Amino acid sequence: MLDVATSAPSAALPAEAAEGRLDLGALFTESEVPEFLAELDEGLIGLKPVKRRIREIAAHLVIGRAREKLGLTSGAPTLHMAFTGNPGTGKTTVALKMAQILHRLGYVRRGHLVSVTRDDLVGQYIGHTAPKTKEILKKAMGGVLFIDEAYYLYRPENERDYGQEAIEILLQVMENQRDDLVVILAGYKDRMDRFFESNPGFRSRIAHHIDFPDYEDAELVEIAKTMAADADYTFSPEAEVAIEEYVAKRRLQPNFANARSIRNALDRMRLRQSLRLFESGGLADRAALSTISEGDVRASRVFAGGIDAPDYKPQTE
């Protein structure tokens, strides 16, 4: 379970209404939301449709605050969301940024993100589920609760499954305490669609559905370079070409997980580079210690027609 706290202070927007008018540009700037959106743009490669939706939601919330300042009706917005898409497409990262935005605008008190799965909510025996679920909700209050692979909460084929108890508690809190908690349900799009069909209570409480597309090959190559640079590594020119080929081949294999697959592949490349340098002996400068060679990339089983190590293993249903 992940519990990430943000450092942004909770404060009302410091804008002044003069003669019944507001400077929306100043209001937006003073909210610090542009900073969070810029971080989202710079920190996440691709995902243009997702960034657009987050920008729309942020703008709607800022305008809602402006309406309040001028005495217009601005009821509490429903902010529960559904993030759908394949693994490794940035859903958790965007959820954390959304928590920061909501906190800065005063829609949640603390602005932290609590990330959970079914195992964190559902017990294994009678009387175990309610305390587990309520404890998680208590920890998430004032922030955002992110439930990954939310459809695993619902297992109608098992009459003795306790997931339904967790669902009922969640639905009640999402309705009655929506001014103090935002819930984001995440998972594969097709499974989430079936989950909502079987649980209309969730569908009626979700205001924003955001689909996270798979990354393009070029975007994954750029992600690999960025991840390497963040760890003080670079690819040789030949290795960059090999990375492009790796991405194209790896995408066709089972359990491909977008950026997660790239991160895991990079970890293996670094291991190969370390072994290569260790076995070579002799002197090594900064360039040698930080450069991933073509051989470090092509040593992957992907290039031999084999199956790369699994990057994502979904739960069994």
Swiss-Prot record:
CDD domains: AAA (cd00009). GO terms for molecular function: ATP binding; ATP hydrolysis activity. It comes from the Bacteria. InterPro entries: AAA+_ATPase, AAA_lid_6, ATPase_AAA_core, CbxX/CfqX_mono, CbxX/CfxQ, CbxX/CfxQ_RuBisCO_ESX, P-loop_NTPase. Signal peptide: none annotated. Keywords: ATP-binding, Nucleotide-binding. Pfam families: AAA, AAA_lid_6. ATP binds at residues 85-92. Necessary for the expression of RuBisCO. Belongs to the CbxX/CfxQ family. This is Protein CfxQ.
